[in-house]
């Protein structure tokens, strides 16, 4: 008995080279997508470490080099109304002054220089060091007709609770400068320091002169505090130029040489310098 003939061969199908490569890559792509989804799920489910909780409590990642840090391009800063050599944006609100709630406004300081600075949040880390440093040296500012006001997006009630917390526990204790509440964020937005994505401000510092004109702006990223010595120096320099009409070179301090702002005057300065 003869064996049955073999079945006819199936017609060959030829895939285009491009389509063939796509089909080969499809399982790999599906695997990578599934792995990414699992990692994302695990990240959401994993409890925060103590360090991460501190960062979250402070309003975001605040140390250099962190991969999860929000990039500058993703920050949403409001258009600032604060312009150098123009009237400072008006503000008013409730502040804690000597343990009491009082209404405070920018015009209360007309006739004096004002150091007006923003800090991110109460009960954090760098912020109390700045407020205490300025508060402990308020007499040096007042001796040159200058006042200091600190502001954050916290309420006056949170401010008071922080003041009533001992310094050894991270509180402020008794302080000599007002803490202004900006609960609706309007002041922070007007001064261009409010981070919409984080819900708090950058470390902004503004020097306003005795006529209400904005003379200086400093904006620090979150991890680094500001210098009381440098702020005092800047106020003294602006006051000197207001009174004498001369200009202050780099690093100028009271008693140092200044420059008469004309061609002959500058030559006298550079001749002494060199």
From Swiss-Prot:
The keyword Disulfide bond applies. The keyword Disulfide bond applies. One of its GO terms (biological process) is response to oxidative stress. It catalyses: a hydroperoxide + [thioredoxin]-dithiol = an alcohol + [thioredoxin]-disulfide + H2O. It comes from the Eukaryota. Residues 82-240 form the Thioredoxin domain. It is found in: Cytoplasm; Endoplasmic reticulum. Pfam families: 1-cysPrx_C, AhpC-TSA. Its EC number is 1.11.1.24. This is Peroxiredoxin-4. One of its GO terms (cellular component) is cytosol. Its main location: cytoplasm. The active site is a conserved redox-active cysteine residue, the peroxidatic cysteine (C(P)), which makes the nucleophilic attack on the peroxide substrate. The peroxide oxidizes the C(P)-SH to cysteine sulfenic acid (C(P)-SOH), which then reacts with another cysteine residue, the resolving cysteine (C(R)), to form a disulfide bridge. The disulfide is subsequently reduced by an appropriate electron donor to complete the catalytic cycle. In this typical 2-Cys peroxiredoxin, C(R) is provided by the other dimeric subunit to form an intersubunit disulfide. It comes from Bos taurus (Bovine). The gene is PRDX4. InterPro entries: AhpC/TSA (IPR000866), Peroxiredoxin (IPR050217), Peroxiredoxin_C (IPR019479), Thioredoxin-like_sf (IPR036249), Thioredoxin_domain (IPR013766). The active site is at residue 127. Residues 1-40 form the signal peptide. Keywords: Antioxidant, Cytoplasm, Disulfide bond, Endoplasmic reticulum, Oxidoreductase, Peroxidase, Redox-active center, Signal. Gene3D superfamilies: Glutaredoxin. It is an enzyme of class 1 (oxidoreductase). The enzyme can be inactivated by further oxidation of the cysteine sulfenic acid (C(P)-SOH) to sulphinic acid (C(P)-SO2H) and sulphonic acid (C(P)-SO3H) instead of its condensation to a disulfide bond.
